[in-house]
C-alpha cells in the first residue's frame, strides 16, 4: 500500500532553486508512496554504463531522478518499492555484502530509514562508507574522518558511555573506537499502514512510570537544592563538577527517520530513559511557530504536500528535534519524520497544498485527508454526517462519500471559525499528559472510524483486529538468505513481499503468496502500459526499475530488486547486457537461482483467477436441456449492445432469434447494427430510460447480456471514479433490468444472463459486483482463440462457463492468418486493442505490427476485424474513418470467446 514518506528534508537552509524544485515535485510528480521510497525520498534511478535495449521513459519525469538507459522507472499504485542500491543520508551508495542474520540488529534501510540514536553525527562525514549486513549498517573504520574529529568524538563517546550505564558498550576490535557513530540500540520498528497498536493498559503503565520518574527527579532536585543551601559555594561547585553533563543527541533534519514505538525495557535502563523523558527543557521554543498539536502540511522531496500533526519527541521514541525542525506525525499511516519549519504550512493553507491528482490516484493520501479533516472538524465543532458500514470495502467507500463535504468545507476556509478553530486544545499542547489517544487505538478505528464517544463499553480482546505483520524489503532479504542456507522452505514465505502469512502458492514460480499480494496480482497481472508491457513486476506486482522481456510475443517485466534477490546478485546487470534477453517465463531453463518456474504455470494461472473468490454463493440454478420438439426461438435483451456481437454469434451458432432488444447510445454502433442485421434489432436508446413497464411490454426474455463501460472501473485509468460514480454506476442499471427480466416465481422456463467487464479492476469493485450478481466471475483471455490478448471477467449462469477454452479450425490464432496478401506479421499475437490509436503499436520500441514493402505498417481495419473474429468489412458503413472503426472494435467483445460461452444454448432454443 502506498505509503507516506517519513524522512526529513535534507537542508534547512536550501536555496530558492531547491525549494522551487521541491514545489514542482509535489505538483507534477505523482509517484505512489512505496515502502522503500519512504526510506529514500530522493532516490535516484540506478545508472548503467551501457545503453540497453530496455529503454523506457517514465510517464512523469522527476526533477531529481536522472534517466536510466537500461532500466525503466515504474510507479505502481499499491506496490512496494525496494531499491537495489540504497542511498545514505549524504547521498553515498551503500555497498552490499552477503546478508548475515543478526538478531536484534537494526535495519539501516528499513521503512523510514531512521538512524538509531547517535546516527545524526554521521552526517558530518562527507564520504561515509558502510557495508550492509542483513540491513545493518556498519561504518568502516576511520573512513573519511579527520583525525581531530575522530579524537574529539572518541572522548565524547567515553564520557557518554559513563552516563549511559547499561546502554554503554566497550568499543574495541570492531572498529568502533575510531567511529563517529555510536552503536545503535535495537529498535522495534513498524511499517507503513495502520498505526502500531498499543493497549491502553500498557500505555497507562508507561505514563505512570514517566510520572513517577518525574516526581523522583523533582525530589532529587529539591534535595540537592536543600544541600546547596547548607553547603558553601566551594562545595557546591565541586558537586556540580562531579557530575558530567548528559550528552543529548540532536536529531539531524537531513537524516531519514523511522516511526518507532518505545519498548518496555529493563528497570535500570527504564529509569535512565524515563529521566531523559522528564526533561523540563521547553520544546519548539525557537519562536518559529508550529507548536505541539498543530495540524500542518509537510513537504518532502519528491512528494506532494502531506497532512500531519506536530508531536513531541517523546511520542516518537527518538531524541529531540534540532532547532528549526519539528517532529511530524503523518496522517494516513501514523509514521514520524523530522521536518524543518521552512517545509511546513498550517492546515489552513488547504487551497494551496491540497493536490487533487494525488487524491484521485493514491488511497493513502485519501485516507490522510480523511483523518486530518476529522480532527479539524472535531476541533472546529463542525459536524458532518457519519456513514456506518460493516466491512472494509464499504467503509472505504463511505469515507469517499464523507470526504467530499469535508474537503469543500476545507477549501472554503474552514468557516465559520476559520484557522482559529483549528488550534489544538490546551491539553494537547502539554506533551506529558495523556493525549493523542486516537493514535493508539486499534488500527481500523484509527483509519476510518469517527472520533469515539467519551465513554464506551470495553471491548473484549477477541473483538480487536489483529495488528498487521511487520514486513519490509529487509525481511524478505533475511528470509531469502535463510532459504539459501537451507534453513527455510521457499514455499513457506511470500516471494513477493517476504510475509510469512502465506495463503496460497505463487501461480508462476515456486514459492508462497500472501493475501495482500494475491489482491495486487489479481489487479495488476493483466494491466499493461502504453508500450504493451505489464505495468508491474511479474513476481511482486511492484518495482520502480524493471527489465522488459526481449521476446516480441512476451509482455512480462521483472523488477531489478526481485531479480537480484531471487536469481542472484548481479543478475539484473547481466540481463541488461544480454541482447535480446528472454525473461524467466520464456527462457529454456526452468530454474534461475531460487526462481523456479512452475511446469504447469498456464493451468495454475487459469485456476488462480478461477478460484480467487473471497465470497461463496449458492450455485446457479441448473436448467435441464429442452427436448428438441419443445425448443423455441430465443428472445434477447442486450444492454450496452455495441456493434451487436451477441446477435452475430447467435446467428453463427444457428440459433433462431425471435426478438433482439438492444440498448445503445453510440450512433456509429447503432448504424453498424442496423446495416449488418437488416433492421432486425430494436434499439431502445439509453439504458437509464428503460423501465420495468418496458420490460414487461417487450418480454419475456430468455437471455440478458451486457457489459457496462469500463472507464471508471479499470485501474489503468488514474482518474477512475469507481463503481459508484461516473460510468461505473451503469452496472446498477444492468442489475436493475436483470432483476426486472427474471422469470416470476413458479416459472421454470430456462433463463440465462451474462455480464462482462475488465480484469484490471479493483478487488473491492469486483467483490461488490459479485455480491450484487450473487455469482463469482470466470476469467477468459481471448489469446487462446484469437490473435490478440484480451482478458475479461464474465459473470453469468450460462452452462459450462468454467469449461476449458478450446479453439476451432476456423479460429485465427496467429496474426499472420489475419493479414491481407503481401503483408508480413512481425508478431504472432498483438496486445489488447483499445479505442486509442497507439494501442496498435507493439513492444517496448513501439513497432507497428506489420511489415509491407520493406516498411512497417499499422493494422488495416479489415485485419483488425479478423483479429476480433468479425466478418471482413463488418464495420465498414457510412464512410466511417479508420479511427472511428477502431473505436467500435476496441469496445466490442471477441467473437470466438462469446461463441464459446453461447454454444451450450443450442440445447435450449430452436436452431435453424
Curated annotation (Swiss-Prot):
Pfam families: ADD_DNMT3 (PF17980), DNA_methylase (PF00145), DNM3A_N (PF22855), DNMT3_ADD_GATA1-like (PF21255), PWWP (PF00855). Residues 634-912 form the SAM-dependent MTase C5-type domain. Changing residue 699 to D: In a patient with chronic myelomonocytic leukemia. Keywords: Chromatin regulator, Chromosome, Cytoplasm, Disease variant, DNA-binding, Dwarfism, Intellectual disability, Isopeptide bond, Metal-binding, Methylation, Methyltransferase, Nucleus, Phosphoprotein, Repressor, S-adenosyl-L-methionine, Transferase, Ubl conjugation, Zinc, Zinc-finger. Residues 17-40, 149-167, 269-279 have a biased composition (Basic and acidic residues). S-adenosyl-L-methionine binds at residues 641-645, 664, 686-688, 891-893. Highly expressed in fetal tissues, skeletal muscle, heart, peripheral blood mononuclear cells, kidney, and at lower levels in placenta, brain, liver, colon, spleen, small intestine and lung. It is an enzyme of class 2 (transferase). Its main location: nucleus. Residues 199-403 are annotated as: Interaction with DNMT1 and DNMT3B. Residues 482-614 form the ADD domain. Changing residue 749 to C: In TBRS; somatic mutation. Residues 494-586 are annotated as: Interaction with the PRC2/EED-EZH2 complex. Changing residue 548 to K: In TBRS; somatic mutation. The active site is at residue 710. Changing residue 648 to P: In TBRS; somatic mutation. Signal peptide: none annotated. A zinc finger (PHD-type) spans 534-590. One of its GO terms (biological process) is methylation. Changing residue 333 to N: In HESJAS; changed DNA methylation; results in aberrant expression of genes involved in developmental processes. GO terms for molecular function: chromatin binding; DNA (cytosine-5-)-methyltransferase activity; DNA binding; identical protein binding; lncRNA binding; protein-cysteine methyltransferase activity; RNA polymerase II cis-regulatory region sequence-specific DNA binding; RNA polymerase II-specific DNA-binding transcription factor binding. Sumoylated; sumoylation disrupts the ability to interact with histone deacetylases (HDAC1 and HDAC2) and repress transcription. Changing residue 529 to N: In TBRS; uncertain significance. Required for genome-wide de novo methylation and is essential for the establishment of DNA methylation patterns during development. DNA methylation is coordinated with methylation of histones. It modifies DNA in a non-processive manner and also methylates non-CpG sites. May preferentially methylate DNA linker between 2 nucleosomal cores and is inhibited by histone H1. Plays a role in paternal and maternal imprinting. Required for methylation of most imprinted loci in germ cells. Acts as a transcriptional corepressor for ZBTB18. This is DNA (cytosine-5)-methyltransferase 3A. It comes from Homo sapiens.
Amino acid at each position: 500500500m502506498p505509503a507516506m514518506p517519513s524522512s526529513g528534508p535534507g537542508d534547512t537552509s536550501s536555496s530558492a532553486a531547491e525549494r522551487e524544485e521541491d514545489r514542482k515535485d509535489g505538483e507534477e510528480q505523482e509517484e505512489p508512496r512505496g515502502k522503500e521510497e519512504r526510506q529514500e525520498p530522493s532516490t535516484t534511478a540506478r545508472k548503467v554504463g551501457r545503453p540497453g535495449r530496455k529503454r523506457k521513459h517514465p510517464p512523469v519525469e522527476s526533477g531529481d531522478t536522472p534517466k536510466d538507459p537500461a532500466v525503466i522507472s515504474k510507479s505502481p499504485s499499491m506496490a512496494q518499492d525496494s531499491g537495489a542500491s540504497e542511498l545514505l543520508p549524504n547521498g553515498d551508495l551503500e555497498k552490499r555484502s552477503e546478508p548475515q542474520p543478526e538478531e536484534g540488529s537494526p535495519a539501516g534501510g528499513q521503512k523510514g530509514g531512521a538512524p538509531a540514536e547517535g546516527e545524526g553525527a554521521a552526517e558530518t562525514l562527507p564520504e561515509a562508507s558502510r557495508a550492509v549486513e542483513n540491513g545493518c549498517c556498519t561504518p568502516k573504520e576511520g573512513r573519511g574522518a579527520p583525525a581531530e574529529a575522530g579524537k574529539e568524538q572518541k572522548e565524547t563517546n567515553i564520557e557518554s558511555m559513563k552516563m549511559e550505564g547499561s546502554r554503554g558498550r566497550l568499543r574495541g576490535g570492531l572498529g568502533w573506537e575510531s567511529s563517529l557513530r555510536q552503536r545503535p540500540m535495537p529498535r522495534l520498528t513498524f511499517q507503513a499502514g495502520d498505526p502500531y497498536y498499543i493497549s491502553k493498559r500498557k500505555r497507562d503503565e508507561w505514563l505512570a512510570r514517566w510520572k513517577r520518574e518525574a516526581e523522583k527527579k523533582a525530589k532529587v532536585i529539591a534535595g540537592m537544592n536543600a544541600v546547596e543551601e547548607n553547603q558553601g559555594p566551594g562545595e557546591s561547585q565541586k558537586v556540580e563538577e562531579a557530575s558530567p553533563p548528559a550528552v543529548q543527541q540532536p536529531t539531524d533534519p537531513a537524516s531519514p527517520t523511522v516511526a518507532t514505538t518505545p519498548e518496555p525495557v529493563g528497570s535500570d535502563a527504564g529509569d535512565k530513559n524515563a529521566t531523559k523523558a522528564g526533561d523540563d527543557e521547553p520544546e519548539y521554543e525557537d519562536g518559529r511557530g508550529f507548536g505541539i498539536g498543530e495540524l500542518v502540511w509537510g513537504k518532502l522531496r519528491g512528494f506532494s504536500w502531506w497532512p500531519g500533526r506536530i508531536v513531541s519527541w517523546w511520542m516518537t521514541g527518538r531524541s529531540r528535534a534540532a532547532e528549526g525542525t519539528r517532529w511530524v506525525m503523518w496522517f494516513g499511516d501514523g509514521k514520524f519524520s523530522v521536518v524543518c519549519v521552512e517545509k511546513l504550512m498550517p492546515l489552513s493553507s488547504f487551497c494551496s497544498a491540497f493536490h487533487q491528482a494525488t487524491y484521485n490516484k493514491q488511497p493513502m493520501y485519501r485516507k490522510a485527508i480523511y483523518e486530518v479533516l476529522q480532527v479539524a472538524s472535531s476541533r472546529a465543532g463542525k459536524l458532518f454526517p457519519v456513514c456506518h458500514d460493516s466491512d472494509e470495502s464499504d467503509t472505504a467507500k463511505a469515507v469517499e462519500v464523507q470526504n467530499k463535504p469535508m474537503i469543500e468545507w476545507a477549501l472554503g476556509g474552514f468557516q465559520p471559525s476559520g484557522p482559529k478553530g483549528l488550534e489544538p486544545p490546551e491539553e494537547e499542547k502539554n506533551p506529558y499528559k495523556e493525549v493523542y489517544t486516537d493514535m493508539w487505538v486499534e488500527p481500523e478505528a484509527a483509519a476510518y472510524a469517527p472520533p469515539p464517544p467519551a465513554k464506551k463499553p470495553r471491548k473484549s480482546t477477541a473483538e480487536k483486529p489483529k495488528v498487521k505483520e511487520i514486513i519490509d524489503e529487509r525481511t524478505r532479504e533475511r528470509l531469502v538468505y535463510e532459504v539459501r542456507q537451507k534453513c527455510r522452505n521457499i514455499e513457506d514465505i511470500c516471494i513477493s513481499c517476504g510475509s510469512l502469512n502465506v495463503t496460497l502458492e505463487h501461480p508462476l514460480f515456486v514459492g508462497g503468496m500472501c493475501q495482500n499480494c494475491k489482491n495486487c496480482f489479481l489487479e495488476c497481472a493483466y494491466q499493461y502500459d502504453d508500450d504493451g508491457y505489464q505495468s508491474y513486476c511479474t513476481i511482486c506486482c511492484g518495482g520502480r526499475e524493471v527489465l522488459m522481456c526481449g521476446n516480441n510475443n512476451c509482455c512480462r517485466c521483472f523488477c531489478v530488486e526481485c531479480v537480484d534477490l531471487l536469481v542472484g546478485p548481479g543478475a539484473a546487470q547481466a540481463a541488461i547486457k544480454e541482447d535480446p534477453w528472454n525473461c524467466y517465463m520464456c527462457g529454456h531453463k526452468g530454474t534461475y537461482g531460487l526462481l523456479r518456474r512452475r511446469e504447469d504455470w498456464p493451468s495454475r494461472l487459469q485456476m488462480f483467477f478461477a478460484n480467487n473468490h473471497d465470497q461463496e454463493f449458492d450455485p446457479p440454478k441448473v436448467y435441464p436441456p429442452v427436448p428438441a420438439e419443445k425448443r423455441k426461438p430465443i428472445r434477447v435483451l442486450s444492454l450496452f449492445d455495441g456493434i451487436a456481437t451477441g446477435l452475430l454469434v447467435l446467428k453463427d451458432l444457428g440459433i433462431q432469434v425471435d426478438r433482439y432488444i438492444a440498448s445503445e447510445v453510440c450512433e456509429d454502433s447503432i448504424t453498424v447494427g442496423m446495416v449488418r442485421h437488416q433492421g432486425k434489432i430494436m434499439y431502445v436508446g439509453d439504458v437509464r430510460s428503460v423501465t420495468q413497464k418496458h420490460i414487461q411490454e417487450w418480454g419475456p426474455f430468455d437471455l440478458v447480456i451486457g457489459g457496462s463501460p469500463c472507464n471508471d472501473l479499470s485501474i489503468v485509468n488514474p482518474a477512475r471514479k469507481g463503481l459508484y460514480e461516473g460510468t461505473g454506476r451503469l452496472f446498477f442499471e444492468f442489475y436493475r433490468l436483470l432483476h426486472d427480466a427474471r422469470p416470476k416465481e413458479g416459472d421454470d422456463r430456462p433463463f440465462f444472463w451474462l455480464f462482462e467487464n475488465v480484469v484490471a479492476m479493483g478487488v473491492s469493485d469486483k467483490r461488490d459486483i459479485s455480491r450484487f450478481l450473487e455469482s463469482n466471475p470466470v476469467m477468459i483471455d481471448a489469446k487462446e482463440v484469437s490473435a490478440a490478448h484480451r482478458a475479461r471477467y464474465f459473470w453469468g449462469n450460462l452452462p459450462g462457463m468454467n469449461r476449458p477454452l478450446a479453439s476451432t479450425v476456423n479460429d485465427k490464432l496467429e496474426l499472420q492468418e489475419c493479414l491481407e496478401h503481401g503483408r508480413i506479421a512481425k508478431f504472432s499475437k498483438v496486445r489488447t486493442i483499445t479505442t486509442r490509436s497507439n494501442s496498435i503499436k507493439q513492444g517496448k520500441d513501439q513497432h507497428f505490427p506489420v511489415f509491407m514493402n520493406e516498411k512497417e505498417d499499422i493494422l488495416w481495419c479489415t485485419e483488425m476485424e479478423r483479429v476480433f473474429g468479425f466478418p471482413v468489412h463488418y464495420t465498414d458503413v457510412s464512410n466511417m474513418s479508420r479511427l472511428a472503426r477502431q473505436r467500435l472494435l476496441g469496445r466490442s467483445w471477441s467473437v470466438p470467446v462469446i461463441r464459446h460461452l453461447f454454444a451450450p444454448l443450442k440445447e435450449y432454443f430452436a436452431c435453424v
